[in-house]
Amino acid sequence: MKPDSIRRYNVIGSRRISNYWWAIIIGSGGLGFLFTGLSSYLQFNLLPIIHAEKIIFFPQGLVMSFYGILGIFFSLYLGLTILFSVGEGFNEFNKELGIIRIFRWGFPGKNRRIDLSYSIDDVKAIRVELKDGINPKRTIYLCIKGQRQIPLTRVGQPLTLEEIEMQAAELAQFLQKDLLLN
């Protein structure tokens, strides 16, 4: 096997620093709201920095408890996506075997392993989608016969314009397919 006949790109998935950050922030905020709501119900300060006896339980304390529970659930969900490495995987392009393999981890269950394989001959082109603005979108797609387009880049933190162009051009040249800009 020649070292130039295989290209493999790892995809980070949910184990990004920003997901850890948001899980901690949302979880601690949720706990703060829940303790404040419970303190207003019990008329006893569970947190020494908050004077909950000044908060009426119905409706303020009840609403704060609800938001606290909701925040804790969101934090747990984010924590589980990090724990199970949801979205993590790789894109492998093997010219020697003539296959493209796209692998991702999902949530536990019957379909935890997402493993797609395609023939290189089924690939029509590599397409790059660029959208600027408040929420920029920079994605490389694998265009397969039958009008199917499979995203190859990670979700969340977009690559720089230079990185996306280099990766798409390198991939199109490696597969000897057309490069489309959209």
From Swiss-Prot:
<keyword id="KW-0472">Membrane</keyword>
<feature type="transmembrane region" description="Helical">
    <location>
        <begin position="66"/>
        <end position="86"/>
    </location>
</feature>
<keyword id="KW-0934">Plastid</keyword>
<keyword id="KW-1133">Transmembrane helix</keyword>
<feature type="transmembrane region" description="Helical">
    <location>
        <begin position="22"/>
        <end position="42"/>
    </location>
</feature>
<comment type="similarity">
    <text>Belongs to the Ycf4 family.</text>
</comment>
<keyword id="KW-0793">Thylakoid</keyword>
<dbReference type="GO" id="GO:0009522">
    <property type="term" value="C:photosystem I"/>
</dbReference>
<protein>
    <recommendedName>
        <fullName>Photosystem I assembly protein Ycf4</fullName>
    </recommendedName>
</protein>
<dbReference type="GO" id="GO:0009535">
    <property type="term" value="C:chloroplast thylakoid membrane"/>
</dbReference>
<dbReference type="GO" id="GO:0015979">
    <property type="term" value="P:photosynthesis"/>
</dbReference>
<dbReference type="Pfam" id="PF02392">
    <property type="entry name" value="Ycf4"/>
</dbReference>
<keyword id="KW-0812">Transmembrane</keyword>
<keyword id="KW-0150">Chloroplast</keyword>
<keyword id="KW-0602">Photosynthesis</keyword>
<comment type="function">
    <text>Seems to be required for the assembly of the photosystem I complex.</text>
</comment>
<dbReference type="InterPro" id="IPR003359">
    <property type="entry name" value="PSI_Ycf4_assembly"/>
</dbReference>
